[in-house]
C-alpha cells in the first residue's frame, strides 16, 4: 500500500487524494516529530507563566478575556471539543472526513500549533486504522475554519462520540480505538483548539473537486466534439490559429481536444459541398470558449489549493522565533471564493451541454436527424425525457452557482462578525460536480445515438472508439423505446470512471 510521509512543509493534492480515496498509510517524518516537540516546548513554557496567552490559558472567542487556572486547562481543552462538536444533519462522506482529518494533521506537523508529537501520531493511527469520525453536514461557517466538523474528528481522538470502522459499521469511538489498540488522547494546553481551528474541510473538498473536474472537462470536450459531428457541424472553428489570437490557455486546450477527437471525421463539414452552413449555433461553435474559461478557472483554483496545502492554519500560531501570536489565517475567504467561482463555471458547462443535447433532439435544428432520435417518432418518444432530466439537473446547477461566500452571518457575540461560508460553498460545489457528470452523460447518450443514425457517413476514429466503448458498457444504441434509466445510469458510470476519456485517448493519445 502507498505511504504518504507528512513533514513540516505541507502536502500535495496527490497526497490528499491518496489518503482520502485510496486509503494510503501515513507516516510522520523525523523532521515533523522534532518540529512538534520544539513547538510544544514553547507552549509548555508559556503555560508555566502567569501571563494569559490566548488558547493556552484563556477562554475562546468572545470568552477570551477569562484567564484559566492551570488545574482547569485540561478540562478547558476537552470542553472546547465537546461543545464545538455540534454538527447536525446527514453524515458527510467518508472521503471528505479523511481529507479534512489528514489536512489538519498536515498543519499540526508544521510545528506551528504546539500539539504534542503523540497527539499527531494518534491522528495518523486513527486514519491508518480506517476509523472515520461521524461528521455532520451542517455546523461550519468557514471561520474560524471548519470548527464543528473538525471538532467531531477531535472527539474521536478523545474516544468519544461515534465513528465508522473500516467495515462501515458505526460504533462508539472508544470501542473502535480499543479494538485497534489506540489509546485516547488526553488533551493539554492549546491542543483542543489546535485540532479544530482550520479550513481543512473546504480545502479537502476543493482538492477532490479539482481532481474530478479534470476528468469531467476532458469528457465535456469529447461530448461537444461528438455533438458537433452528429450535427454535421464545421470543425474549422477549432483551428489553432483562431485560438492563438485570443490567448486563453484553457480555450486553446479545449479546442485542441475537440480537434483531436474529430480528426478524420467524415461527418464534420459534410454539408459544405451542397448547402454550406457558414456558422454553427453558439452552443457548438463556442464550446471551446466556454469550457476553456472553466479550465482557466480551475487553474486559478488549483493555485489557491497549492498555497493552502503548503500553509499552516491555526490561531494562535507558534512562530519560528518562539513567539505565539494571534492571527486571522483561519478565515476561509481564499478557498471559499474559488469554490464559488468553480460552481459558476460548472453550471455554465452543464448549461451549454444541455443546449447541444436539445439541438440533437429537435428535428428543426438537427439537420436531418429524427425527432428526439426516436425509432418511430410518435409511437416512440426517443430521448425526449432524458433531456427533461438533463434540464432539471442544469436548473439545479444554476441554483448551486449562487455564491455562498457573499453571505456572512455574525457569531460568537459579534466577536466573529464576518465569516466565509466556505464549507457551504464546498458542499454545494460537490453536489454540482456530481450533477455535471450526469449532464455530460446525457449528452454522451444522445450524441452517440445520433452519430449511429447518420447512416452512410463515417465518424472520426476517436468518435467510433467512444461509440463502441459506450455500447460495450451496456448503453444501448438506436432502436424502439425502452426503460431509459438503466442506460442513463450506465452512461453516468462510464463518464465518472474515466472510461469516456480512456476510449477517446485510445485513438487521440493524451488529451489536454
From Swiss-Prot:
EC number(s) from the headed UniProt entry: 4.3.1.3
- What PTM annotation applies here? Contains an active site 4-methylidene-imidazol-5-one (MIO), which is formed autocatalytically by cyclization and dehydration of residues Cys-Ser-Gly.
- Matching InterPro entries, A to Z? Aromatic_Lyase, Fumarase/histidase_N, HutH, L-Aspartase-like, Phe/His_NH3-lyase_AS
PTM sites of type 2,3-didehydroalanine (Ser): 144
Localization per Swiss-Prot or TrEMBL:
Cytoplasm
Q: Quote the cellular component terms of the Gene Ontology held in the record.
A: cytoplasm
One matching Pfam family is Lyase_aromatic
Its top-level enzyme class, in one word, is: lyase
One GO MF term on file is: histidine ammonia-lyase activity
Q: Locate residues linked as 5-imidazolinone (Cys-Gly).
A: 143-145
Write out the catalysed reaction. L-histidine = trans-urocanate + NH4(+)
Keywords, ordered alphabetically: Cytoplasm, Histidine metabolism, Lyase
Kindly list the biological process annotations in GO that this record carries.
L-histidine catabolic process; L-histidine catabolic process to glutamate and formamide; L-histidine catabolic process to glutamate and formate
Q: Per its UniProt entry, which superkingdom is the organism in? A: Bacteria
Q: Where are the transmembrane segments?
A: none
Where does this protein act, in terms of pathway?
Answer: Amino-acid degradation; L-histidine degradation into L-glutamate; N-formimidoyl-L-glutamate from L-histidine: step 1/3
Into which family does the record put it?
Belongs to the PAL/histidase family.
Q: What is this protein called?
A: Histidine ammonia-lyase
Q: Which organism is it from?
A: Streptomyces coelicolor (strain ATCC BAA-471 / A3(2) / M145)
Q: Which gene encodes it?
A: hutH
Amino acid at each position: 500500500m502507498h505511504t504518504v510521509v507528512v513533514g513540516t512543509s505541507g502536502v500535495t493534492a496527490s497526497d490528499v487524494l491518496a489518503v482520502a480515496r485510496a486509503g494510503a498509510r501515513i507516516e510522520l517524518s523525523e523532521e515533523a516529530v522534532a518540529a512538534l516537540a520544539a513547538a510544544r516546548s514553547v507552549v509548555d513554557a508559556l503555560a508555566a507563566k502567569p501571563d494569559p496567552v490566548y488558547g493556552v490559558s484563556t477562554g475562546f472567542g468572545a470568552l477570551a478575556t477569562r484567564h484559566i487556572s492551570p488545574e482547569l486547562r485540561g478540562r478547558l481543552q476537552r470542553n472546547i471539543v465537546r461543545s464545538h462538536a455540534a454538527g447536525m444533519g446527514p453524515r458527510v462522506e467518508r472521503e471528505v472526513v479523511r481529507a479534512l482529518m489528514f489536512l489538519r494533521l498536515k498543519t499540526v506537523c508544521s510545528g506551528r500549533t504546539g500539539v504534542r508529537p503523540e497527539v499527531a501520531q494518534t491522528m495518523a493511527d486513527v486514519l491508518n486504522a480506517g476509523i472515520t469520525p461521524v461528521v455532520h453536514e451542517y455546523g461550519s461557517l468557514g471561520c474560524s475554519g471548519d470548527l464543528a466538523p473538525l471538532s467531531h474528528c477531535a472527539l474521536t481522538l478523545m474516544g468519544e462520540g461515534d465513528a465508522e470502522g473500516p467495515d462501515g459499521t458505526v460504533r462508539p469511538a472508544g470501542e473502535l480505538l480499543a479494538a485497534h489498540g489506540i489509546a485516547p488522547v488526553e488533551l493539554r494546553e492549546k491542543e483542543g483548539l489546535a485540532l479544530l481551528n482550520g479550513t481543512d474541510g473546504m480545502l479537502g473538498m476543493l482538492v477532490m473537486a479539482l481532481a474530478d473536474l479534470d476528468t469531467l472537462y476532458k469528457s465535456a470536450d469529447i461530448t461537444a466534439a461528438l455533438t458537433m459531428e452528429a450535427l454535421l457541424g464545421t470543425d474549422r472553428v477549432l483551428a489553432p490559429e483562431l485560438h492563438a489570437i485570443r490567448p486563453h490557455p484553457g480555450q486553446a486546450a479545449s479546442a485542441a481536444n475537440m480537434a483531436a477527437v474529430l480528426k478524420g471525421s467524415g461527418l464534420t463539414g459534410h454539408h459544405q459541398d451542397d448547402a454550406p452552413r457558414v456558422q454553427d449555433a453558439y452552443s457548438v461553435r463556442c464550446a471551446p470558449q466556454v469550457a476553456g474559461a472553466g479550465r482557466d478557472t480551475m487553474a486559478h483554483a488549483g493555485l489557491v489549493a497549492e498555497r493552502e496545502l503548503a500553509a499552516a492554519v491555526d490561531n494562535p500560531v507558534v512562530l519560528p522565533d518562539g513567539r505565539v501570536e494571534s492571527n486571522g489565517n483561519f478565515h476561509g475567504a481564499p478557498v471559499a471564493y474559488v469554490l464559488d467561482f468553480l460552481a459558476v463555471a460548472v453550471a455554465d458547462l452543464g448549461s451549454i451541454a444541455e443546449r447541444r443535447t436539445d439541438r440533437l433532439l429537435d428535428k428543426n435544428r438537427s439537420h436531418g436527424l429524427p425527432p428526439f432520435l426516436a425509432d418511430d417518432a410518435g409511437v416512440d418518444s426517443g430521448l425526449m425525457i432524458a433531456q427533461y432530466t438533463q434540464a432539471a439537473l442544469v436548473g439545479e446547477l444554476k441554483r448551486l452557482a449562487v455564491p455562498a461566500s457573499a453571505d456572512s452571518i455574525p457569531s460568537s457575540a459579534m466577536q466573529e462578525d464576518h465569516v466565509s461560508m466556505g464549507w457551504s460553498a464546498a458542499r454545494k460545489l460537490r453536489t454540482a460536480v456530481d450533477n455535471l457528470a450526469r449532464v455530460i452523460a446525457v449528452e454522451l447518450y444522445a450524441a452517440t445515438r445520433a452519430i449511429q443514425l447518420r447512416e452512410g457517413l463515417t465518424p472520426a476514429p476517436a468518435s467510433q472508439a467512444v461509440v463502441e466503448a459506450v455500447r460495450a458498457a451496456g448503453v444501448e444504441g438506436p432502436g424502439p423505446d425502452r426503460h431509459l434509466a438503466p442506460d442513463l445510469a450506465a452512461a453516468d458510470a462510464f463518464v465518472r470512471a474515466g472510461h469516456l476519456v480512456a476510449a477517446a485517448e485510445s485513438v487521440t493519445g493524451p488529451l489536454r
